[in-house]
């Protein structure tokens, strides 16, 4: 402490605590937005892999299907009236 008195020392300590809290919160918010952006990019690549030329680079992508679902049974029979 700077030796300016008890009140000044308490205010200086409170200022340092506030600064650490603000820095920690900004770091946490930054990491949250970073992971949110990465997750959104991953979802978009998986959902729309055939757009933008990045579909073949995805792990587990099939060149025959390339992101399109093929029905394996007749869906019309479920909804026919």
UniProtKB/Swiss-Prot annotation:
Which cysteines share a disulfide bond? none
Cellular component (GO) terms are: chlorosome envelope
Any one GO molecular function term: bacteriochlorophyll binding
Which residues bind a bacteriochlorophyll c per the record? 25
Per UniProt, the keywords (alphabetical) are: Bacteriochlorophyll, Chlorophyll, Chlorosome, Chromophore, Electron transport, Magnesium, Metal-binding, Photosynthesis, Transport
Pfam families xref list: Bac_chlorC (PF02043)
Indicate whether Magnesium appears among the record's keywords. yes
Gene Ontology annotations of biological process type: photosynthesis
Coiled coil region boundaries: none
Q: Where does the UniProt annotation locate this protein?
A: Chlorosome, Chlorosome envelope
**Role according to the record:** Component of the photosynthetic apparatus. The light harvesting B740 complex binds bacteriochlorophyll c.
| Family membership | Belongs to the BChl C/E-binding protein family.
User: This protein is called what?
Assistant: Bacteriochlorophyll c-binding protein
Q: What is this organism's lineage?
A: Bacteria, Pseudomonadati, Chlorobiota, Chlorobiia, Chlorobiales
């Amino acid at each position: 402490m700077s030796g300016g008195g008890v009140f000044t020392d308490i205010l200086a300590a409170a200022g340092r605590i506030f600064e650490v809290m603000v820095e920690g919160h900004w770091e946490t918010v930054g990491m949250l937005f970073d992971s949110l952006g990465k997750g959104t990019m991953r979802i978009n690549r998986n959902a729309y892999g055939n757009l933008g030329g990045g579909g073949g680079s995805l792990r587990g992508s099939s060149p025959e299907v390339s992101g399109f679902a093929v029905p394996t049974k007749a869906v019309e029979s479920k909804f026919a009236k």
